[in-house]
UniProtKB/Swiss-Prot annotation:
Gene (name only): Slc39a4
Variant or mutagenesis effect after changing G539R: Reduces zinc uptake activity. Accumulated to high levels in the plasma membrane. Does not affect KM. No longer zinc responsive
Record topology, Cytoplasmic segments: 359-376, 442-511, 567-571, 621-630
MF terms in GO: identical protein binding; zinc ion binding; zinc ion sensor activity; zinc ion sequestering activity; zinc ion transmembrane transporter activity
Membrane topology of the entry: Multi-pass membrane protein
Outcome reported for the amino acid change (mutating L382P): Reduces zinc uptake activity. Reduces plasma membrane localization
Family: Belongs to the ZIP transporter (TC 2.A.5) family.
Compartment(s) of residence: Cell membrane; Recycling endosome membrane; Apical cell membrane
PANTHER family noted in UniProt: SOLUTE CARRIER FAMILY 39, ZINC TRANSPORTER ZIP4
Function: Selective transporter that mediates the uptake of Zn(2+). Plays an essential role for dietary zinc uptake from small intestine. The Zn(2+) uniporter activity is regulated by zinc availability. Also exhibits polyspecific binding and transport of Cu(2+), Cd(2+) and possibly Ni(2+) but at higher concentrations.
Catalytic activity line of the entry: Zn(2+)(in) = Zn(2+)(out)
Taxonomic path: Eukaryota, Metazoa, Chordata, Craniata, Vertebrata
Protein name from the UniProt record: Zinc transporter ZIP4
Assembly and interaction partners: Homodimer. Homodimerization is mediated by the transmembrane domain.
Cleaved signal peptide residues: 1-22
Length: 660
C-alpha cells in the first residue's frame, strides 16, 4: 500500500503526462485517411505550439488564432461552435491555410481575425495556389517568410525541409497533390520544430544542367556541350573536322537538337527537384542560395560557384518575359464570376440608356453633342486600352514580379513600352488634328450647309452612329399611326423615288442591327471574362473600355431602331436582348478556365476587335459629321479622346499601386 502523498504524486504525474501527450497527431495522415478529428484540447495545443514557433518584429507574437476561429473555418454555417465541437479531418486543409497565413504575416493575420475576414482570406489563399506555377512561387515565398519569422533554428538538424520534400510527402500520402495537402505537411513540420529552406540548394543548378543535357551521366559529351552552348547563344562553329567530308553523321545539328532540348524545358521531369524549374530568382535570391553577403559582393571564387545558377536561369526560361500575374492580383473563381457579372451588368444597362433619348427629345441638339462626346471618349478608351494595356500584356511587356523579386528592371521595361506606345497614340492624334483643322478651315460644300445643324457628309458606314438629331425626336403621331407615317414625318426625304427603294432595307435594319450587336456583345463578354481571369486590374481596364464604347453604340442602335419605325417598347426589348449575349460570352470565358496562354490569345483577339470598332466604326462617325458649331464639336472630340487616353495611361502606369 503506497502512502497517500505518493499516490497523489503519481496521479498528478499521470495528468501532466496526459496533457503533454495531448499534442496533435500527424495531420497529413489524418487528412489522407479521411477519418478522425481534432478535439479542442488538441487544437489548443497545436495553436500554442504554432505561436511559439513564430517571432514577430517587436517580440513574441500574440495568440490571436483561437480554437473558436479554427472551428468556425471548419463549420462556416455555425460561427459559434458548441464546446464539444471537434475539427473534422476534411477541414484540416482550412486549418493549414490559416496557419500558413499566420506564419507568412502574423500581424496582418491578427488584424484580419479581429475584422472577421479570416475565412474569406483562407478561401482566397487556397484559390491562388491552384495552378502548379502559382503553388511553387507562393510556397517558396512562404518558406522564406517562415525562415525570417522563425523564433529559433534547430542546430542539430543537417538539412532543412524544402518544397520538394513537402511535395513528396503530400504525394506519398496516397492522395492527389494539391496546395492544401502541401500546407498540411508544412504545418506538421512546423509543429515538430523543423527548419525550412525556401530556395533551392546550390547543387540543384548543376543537377538541372546535367539533367537536361547529359544523356550519359555523369559527364556531358562534346556533342551535348555544343547543343548547350548553342542554346545559350555562345560559342562558334568548329571547322576542325570539316576536312573529313565522308563522315557527315558525326556533324552536329545544333538547331535540331536545341529545338528538342527546348521542348524538354517545359515538360515534367522525374526528379523531385524539378519543382524549382519555373522559379525566377533575383540577384538577391542567388546570393542567398550561396550564402554570399550583399555588402561584400561576389568574389572571383564565388563567381565560379554561382555561374551554374545563371546558366540554369537562362536554360529554364523561368525569367523569360511572359506575362505573370502577382498572386495578390488574381481572383478566386467566385470573385471572377461576381465581378465579371457586375461589370457585364453595367455594360448591359447601356441598352436602357436609350430612354434618355426620349427624355431629351426636345433638346435633340444637346443629345447630339453628348453622343459626339461619347463617341470620341469611346475611341480614346478603345485605342488606349488596346495600345497601352492589352498589347503590352499580350506581348509580355507588362509583367509583375513576385514578392521578394527585384521589380526595378520590370518596371523599366514595362514603363518604356508604355511611353513608346503612347507615342503611337501621339502620331494618331497629330494626324487627327491635321484632318480636323483642314475640315474646319477649308470652305464647306453648299450641300452640307443645306443638310441642317448636323449632317454626315454622305458617309454610310456605321448608320447607327451617324444619325442626325432629327432622328432622335419622338413621333408626334398617336400610337394608331402607321410606322410608315412615322418615318415619313420624321424623314420627309424618304418620299422621293430614290429613298423609296431604301424602305425594304429600313425594314431589315432592326434585325441586322440586333444580330450584329448580339455578336459584338458576345465578343465583348469573352474579352471581359478573359480579362477578369487574368487579374482584377486587367478586368477593370477592359470593362472600362467596353463600357465607354458600348454607351454611344447602344444609344446609336436605339436611335436607329426608332428611325426604322419600331415602337419604343420593341426597340428597347431588342436592344436589351442583344446586350444580354455579353453574359453568354462572359460565362463561356470563365467556364472554360483558360490558362495564361489562352488568356493572351483571347486578349489579342479583343485588341483587334477594339481597334477595328474604334478606327473603322466610330472614328469615321466622328470625322464625317458636319455641324453649325464646328469649333464646339472639335473641342468635344478632343475632350473625349484625351480623356479616354489619360484614364488608360494612368491605369497602365499606376495599376500596381492600386490596392483594396
Amino acid at each position: 500500500m503506497l502512502p497517500k502523498s505518493v499516490t497523489q504524486g503519481l496521479v498528478l504525474a499521470l495528468l501532466v503526462g496526459t496533457v503533454a501527450v495531448a499534442r496533435p497527431r500527424n495531420l497529413l495522415s489524418l487528412l489522407a485517411l479521411g477519418q478522425g478529428a481534432l478535439d479542442r484540447l488538441e487544437l489548443d495545443g497545436l495553436l500554442n505550439t504554432l505561436v511559439a514557433r513564430v517571432h514577430c518584429t517587436d517580440g513574441p507574437c500574440e495568440k490571436c488564432l483561437s480554437v473558436e476561429n479554427v472551428l468556425a473555418l471548419g463549420k462556416p454555417d455555425k460561427p459559434q461552435p458548441a464546446p464539444e465541437s471537434v475539427l473534422e479531418s476534411r477541414h484540416i486543409i482550412y486549418l493549414s491555410a490559416a496557419a500558413a497565413l499566420y506564419l507568412n504575416n502574423p500581424e496582418k493575420t491578427c488584424k484580419d481575425i479581429q475584422a472577421g475576414l479570416l475565412a474569406s482570406h483562407v478561401d482566397d489563399y487556397l484559390a491562388t495556389l491552384e495552378s502548379p506555377e502559382a503553388m511553387t512561387l507562393g510556397l517558396s515565398q512562404l518558406l522564406q517568410k517562415i525562415e525570417a519569422h522563425a523564433a529559433s533554428q534547430p542546430t542539430g538538424e543537417k538539412t532543412c525541409v524544402d518544397l520538394p520534400q513537402l511535395l513528396e510527402e503530400a504525394e506519398a500520402a496516397g492522395v492527389s497533390k494539391s496546395a492544401g495537402l502541401v500546407l498540411t505537411a508544412l504545418l506538421d513540420h512546423v509543429i515538430n520544430g523543423s527548419c525550412f529552406q525556401g530556395l533551392p540548394s546550390p547543387q540543384y543548378f548543376v543537377d538541372f544542367v546535367f539533367r537536361l543535357h547529359s544523356s550519359d551521366p555523369p559527364n556531358i559529351t562534346l556533342h551535348e556541350l555544343e547543343n548547350l552552348m548553342h542554346h545559350l547563344g555562345v560559342g562558334g562553329e568548329d571547322h576542325s573536322d570539316h576536312d573529313d567530308h565522308g563522315d557527315h553523321a558525326d556533324h552536329s545539328h545544333p538547331d535540331r537538337k536545341a529545338s528538342h532540348q527546348d521542348s524538354e524545358l517545359h515538360t515534367p521531369h522525374n526528379s523531385n527537384s524539378s519543382v524549382w524549374d519555373t522559379l525566377c530568382l533575383s540577384a538577391k535570391d542567388i546570393m542567398a542560395v550561396y550564402g554570399l553577403s550583399e555588402e561584400a559582393g561576389v568574389s572571383p571564387q564565388a563567381w565560379a560557384q554561382l555561374t551554374p545558377a545563371l546558366v540554369q536561369q537562362q536554360l529554364s526560361g523561368a525569367c523569360s518575359p511572359y506575362p505573370t500575374i502577382r498572386i495578390q492580383d488574381q481572383l478566386s473563381q467566385t470573385e471572377r464570376y461576381l465581378y465579371g457579372s457586375l461589370a457585364t451588368l453595367l455594360i448591359c444597362l447601356c441598352a436602357v440608356f436609350g430612354l434618355l433619348l426620349l427624355t431629351c427629345a426636345k433638346c435633340s441638339t444637346a443629345t447630339h453633342y453628348i453622343m459626339q462626346t461619347f463617341l470620341s471618349l469611346a475611341v480614346g478608351a478603345l485605342t488606349g486600352d488596346a495600345l497601352l494595356h492589352l498589347i503590352p500584356k499580350v506581348l509580355g511587356l507588362h509583367t509583375h514580379g513576385g514578392e521578394g523579386h527585384t521589380h526595378e528592371e520590370e518596371v523599366g521595361v514595362g514603363g518604356q513600352a508604355t511611353w513608346r506606345l503612347l507615342a503611337v497614340l501621339g502620331g494618331f492624334y497629330i494626324f487627327f488634328l491635321f484632318e480636323s483643322f483642314f475640315n474646319l478651315l477649308l470652305p464647306r460644300d453648299q450641300d452640307s450647309e443645306k443638310d441642317g445643324p448636323c449632317s454626315h457628309g454622305g458617309h454610310s458606314h456605321g448608320i447607327s452612329l451617324q444619325l442626325a438629331p432629327s432622328n432622335l425626336r419622338q413621333s408626334k403621331q398617336t400610337h394608331e399611326s402607321s410606322r410608315s407615317d412615322l418615318v415619313a414625318e420624321e424623314t420627309p426625304e424618304l418620299l422621293n423615288p430614290e429613298t423609296r427603294r431604301l424602305r425594304a432595307e429600313l425594314r431589315l435594319l432592326p434585325y441586322l442591327i440586333t444580330l450584329g450587336d448580339a455578336v459584338h456583345n458576345f465578343a465583348d463578354g469573352l474579352a471581359v471574362g478573359a480579362a477578369f481571369s487574368s487579374s482584377w486590374k486587367t478586368g477593370l481596364a477592359t470593362s472600362l473600355a467596353v463600357f465607354c464604347h458600348e454607351l454611344p453604340h447602344e444609344l446609336g442602335d436605339f436611335a436607329a431602331l426608332l428611325h426604322a419605325g419600331l415602337s419604343v417598347k420593341r426597340a428597347l426589348l431588342l436592344n436589351l436582348a442583344s446586350a444580354l449575349t455579353a453574359f453568354a460570352g462572359l460565362y463561356v470565358a470563365l467556364a472554360v478556365g483558360v490558362g495564361e496562354e489562352g488568356e493572351a490569345w483571347i486578349l489579342a483577339v479583343a485588341t483587334g476587335l477594339f481597334l477595328y470598332v474604334a478606327l473603322c466604326d466610330m472614328l469615321p462617325a466622328m470625322m464625317n459629321v458636319r455641324d453649325q458649331r464646328p469649333w464646339l464639336l472639335f473641342l468635344l472630340h478632343n475632350v473625349g479622346l484625351l480623356g479616354g487616353w489619360t484614364v488608360l495611361l494612368l491605369l497602365s502606369l499606376y495599376e500596381d499601386n492600386i490596392t483594396f
